[in-house]
Amino acid sequence: MSQHRHQRHSRVISSSPVDTTSVGFCPTFKKFKRNDDECRAFVKRVIMSRFFKIIMISTVTSNAFFMALWTSYDIRYRLFRLLEFSEIFFVSICTSELSMKVYVDPINYWKNGYNLLDVIIIIVMFLPYALRQLMGKQFTYLYIADGMQSLRILKLIGYSQGIRTLITAVGQTVYTVASVLLLLFLLMYIFAILGFCLFGSPDNGDHDNWGNLAAAFFTLFSLATVDGWTDLQKQLDNREFALSRAFTIIFILLASFIFLNMFVGVMIMHTEDSIRKFERELMLEQQEMLMGEKQVILQRQQEEISRLMHIQKNADCTSFSELVENFKKTLSHTDPMVLDDFGTSLPFIDIYFSTLDYQDTTVHKLQELYYEIVHVLSLMLEDLPQEKPQSLEKVDEK
């Protein structure tokens, strides 16, 4: 029986060597403990700091500006050294950012979609250099890799909470928008077949716009966006199609005024929901920060009280009055002291008079309010005797 168990175990191992490696590696990796907690905490504080975010936003923005200058051949020729230096600086900054984030949390870093977007952008950065080294400068598709460098501006998404909120809203509307687009496609399919049969006849039909299904779909898309629909309708009127105007008006009403507005409405609804959720999360974060600050203050107060109690326990004084007397003996003639007759000082008298003025103003306003309340109540009492006989008359009539 032990041999059979050993054979079965060996058969499983031999069938999946990758699983065996992962099974052996995971416990070892879980038991692994890093000894650089202080350094990692410092790097994390640097990454989460406001100054670091400002540096990254400024770097990405300046690189986008230099890329706009790079599109001009004259500027590229005259500022070649500056553009090359800015390129090297930007690539080094982005690579350093990636290295720092992976160093802080090498496992959870890959679970964030925006971090994966940064990795893809860095791969796109190195793509032109790799193609020039491997395929040469005359490679056919090298211009595509150069054009993809415009994706660098997407690094700003990770540093803008507002943009992330909008992207979340767009992601939540995928299924609803897909349903709306499917309905619009079905509507266009029905009208494309109908338009091909009505206006795409071989004899006197409009072959450019309705000659086949693909042309009919493209024409209907122009009608749905209400782009040049008058020119399309004029071509149908020139061929004297009887139902052309009814066809065009009905499709524009359904496609443009209903489905496209429905699409916009769905986007607005989900965007508002995402904004409300973002505001709630921001409020919770502010409350957590406030509670954290309060906890720090309370902890400091507790430590101070504990320190004072410890000092009092270790003191030689038997009572508080004795402690005060001993404290007075340590005073010199140059030490500042708070006088007991604070109520007779000029600042206190000034504040006291101002408080009395505020109190008189408040009493005066309250009296005016009471007068208005009494006046309203008197008017209500005057109306009550007039309503009472009417109710009695109704009772008598019954």
From Swiss-Prot:
Gene Ontology annotations for the cellular component aspect, listed alphabetically? acrosomal vesicle; CatSper complex; endoplasmic reticulum; motile cilium; plasma membrane
Q: Which gene encodes it?
A: CATSPER3
Q: Name one GO biological process term.
A: sperm capacitation
Instruction: Spell out the molecular function terms from Gene Ontology.
Output: voltage-gated calcium channel activity
List where in the cell it is found: Cell projection, Cilium, Flagellum membrane
**Protein name (database record):** Cation channel sperm-associated protein 3
Give TM segment ranges: 49-71, 81-107, 109-131, 144-160, 169-195, 243-268
Q: Which residues lie within the membrane without crossing it?
A: 217-236
Keyword tags: Calcium, Calcium channel, Calcium transport, Cell membrane, Cell projection, Cilium, Developmental protein, Differentiation, Flagellum, Ion channel, Ion transport, Membrane, Spermatogenesis, Transmembrane, Transmembrane helix, Transport, Voltage-gated channel
Q: Which residues lie on this side of the membrane: Cytoplasmic?
A: 1-48, 108, 161-168, 269-398
Kindly list any coiled-coil regions of this protein: none
The record's subunit annotation is:
Component of the CatSper complex or CatSpermasome composed of the core pore-forming members CATSPER1, CATSPER2, CATSPER3 and CATSPER4 as well as auxiliary members CATSPERB, CATSPERG, CATSPERD, CATSPERE, CATSPERZ, C2CD6/CATSPERT, TMEM249, TMEM262 and EFCAB9. HSPA1 may be an additional auxiliary complex member. The core complex members CATSPER1, CATSPER2, CATSPER3 and CATSPER4 form a heterotetrameric channel.
Activity regulation, free text: The CatSper calcium channel is indirectly activated by extracellular progesterone and prostaglandins following the sequence: progesterone > PGF1-alpha = PGE1 > PGA1 > PGE2 >> PGD2. The CatSper calcium channel is directly inhibited by endocannabinoid 2-arachidonoylglycerol (2AG). Indirect activation by progesterone takes place via the following mechanism: progesterone binds and activates the acylglycerol lipase ABHD2, which in turn mediates hydrolysis of 2AG inhibitor, relieving inhibition of the CatSper channel.
The record describes the protein's role as:
Pore-forming subunit of the CatSper complex, a sperm-specific voltage-gated calcium channel that plays a central role in calcium-dependent physiological responses essential for successful fertilization, such as sperm hyperactivation, acrosome reaction and chemotaxis towards the oocyte.
Catalyzes what?
Ca(2+)(in) = Ca(2+)(out)
Q: Which tissue types show expression of this protein?
A: Testis-specific.
Bilayer topology annotation: Multi-pass membrane protein
Please list the residue ranges that the record places on the Extracellular side of the membrane: 72-80, 132-143, 196-216, 237-242
Do you know which PANTHER family this protein is assigned to?
CATION CHANNEL SPERM-ASSOCIATED PROTEIN 3
| Residues spanning the signal sequence | none
The answer to whether UniProt assigns keyword Acyltransferase to this entry is no
Acyltransferase recorded as keyword: no
Task: Please give the organism.
Answer: Homo sapiens
Q: What is its main location?
A: membrane
Family to which the UniProt record says this protein belongs: Belongs to the cation channel sperm-associated (TC 1.A.1.19) family.
